[in-house]
Amino acid sequence: MKLVTAIIKPFTLDDVKEALEQLGLLGMTVSEVRGYGRQKGHTEVYRGAEYSVDFVAKLKVEVLVEDDTADRAVDAVVNAARTGRIGDGKVWVTPVDTVVRVRTGERGVDAL
């Protein structure tokens, strides 16, 4: 099993969710996060004064998948979240040893 983690722009969430659902992936965890990469934040103007904003609001999407689905899930997220502009995000895949569905005690792929 794999954990596909994506950091995306908030306005792309609906497209990412729909792309993952088309793969049959119906469960995901979404968290509001803040960070920066190469863009190193941005500046905003408030009441005529310019302020530097170091951290940019993003969403972290996490999806547990079977090994053979990971590449398709990554492609789906990338295609749905890409705007072609700085700050589109990152996607990475992490191996997962064990998953347990708390309610039933099911383990492994059955818990997905």
Language-model region placement:
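Positively charged, small/polar-rich N-terminal and surface patches that mediate targeting and assembly
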Residues: 1-112
